[in-house]
């Protein structure tokens, strides 16, 4: 077995999988079912990769032994080239499966979108990004819920927070964090000149109660009237909720019609922001040791340009250019996400094996 795939580690993974399977079949404590099922589901494809890889190694050993038998030698000589080609591919596939998983990948996510430079056009583009992510969520069967939305006078957005729930949400959206730049002729531009503006996207993994504990003494809760486009009040009751986390200064707002629901959403958003702060601190602490990552990891980094006159989208982190901007803005993001994920895995694999 290759040095990068020690037999004892593979055996430990298989043993753990078999233990979890026995636990599920034996009727675990109801409070443990979700945790056991999640770990079992995560290990199942890894164990399948291990089984396939070890079967190839066994077939290779058998074929090499057959070379000594004159009657079996022709069959072995026919089989060996196939195995010699299959084993490296299987080993790489298994190495990818063994890469450390981000514990947040399976979590729901919060998407925060804010216009940057560019005035009204930036606010309109921020609205376009929200619609793009909404359509992407619909295409993947996810549930996207608007937590807070402040609209601009021309139909764009001043600020938006949305919650997305579904399978592998954070894993698929985490590379969207950064500055998105747009180049196009604004509808209000009579001279036909191309303007450049930008919007900032932050994708945060949603925190669970067990991730972050917030003492009641650390928060201040205020109620107010929800506001719509231009700042006008959209209802006559103080239903919107603003929560301030005093130690950090973080402020979150939820402005749905139900004040009770707004308290729940605002607290969830606050937990997520604080959880994200903890993750950023941990990332910063590891930065000196980290040799490979997609982009700088800085949310102020320009990650992508959307050029409407050319129908072009360019992701600057991996030098990916696609000439299907209309489809991208309609939520066709899988090709981009897949390319970013593949590059991230390749860099981590190179670091692990190099």
Curated annotation (Swiss-Prot):
Family per record: Belongs to the prokaryotic/mitochondrial release factor family.
Residues recorded with modification N5-methylglutamine: 232
Lineage, opening ranks: Bacteria, Pseudomonadati, Pseudomonadota, Alphaproteobacteria, Rhodobacterales
InterPro entries attached to this UniProt entry: PCRF (IPR005139), Pep_chain_release_fac_I (IPR000352), Pep_chain_release_fac_I_sf (IPR045853), Prokaryotic/Mito_RF (IPR050057), RF-1 (IPR004373)
SUPFAM superfamilies, per the entry: Release factor (SSF75620)
Species in which this protein is naturally found: Jannaschia sp. (strain CCS1)
Post-translational modifications reported in the UniProt record: Methylated by PrmC. Methylation increases the termination efficiency of RF1.
Pfam families given in the database record: PCRF, RF-1
Keyword field contains Ribosomal protein: no
Protein localization: Cytoplasm
Protein's name in the database: Peptide chain release factor 1
Primary role: Peptide chain release factor 1 directs the termination of translation in response to the peptide chain termination codons UAG and UAA.
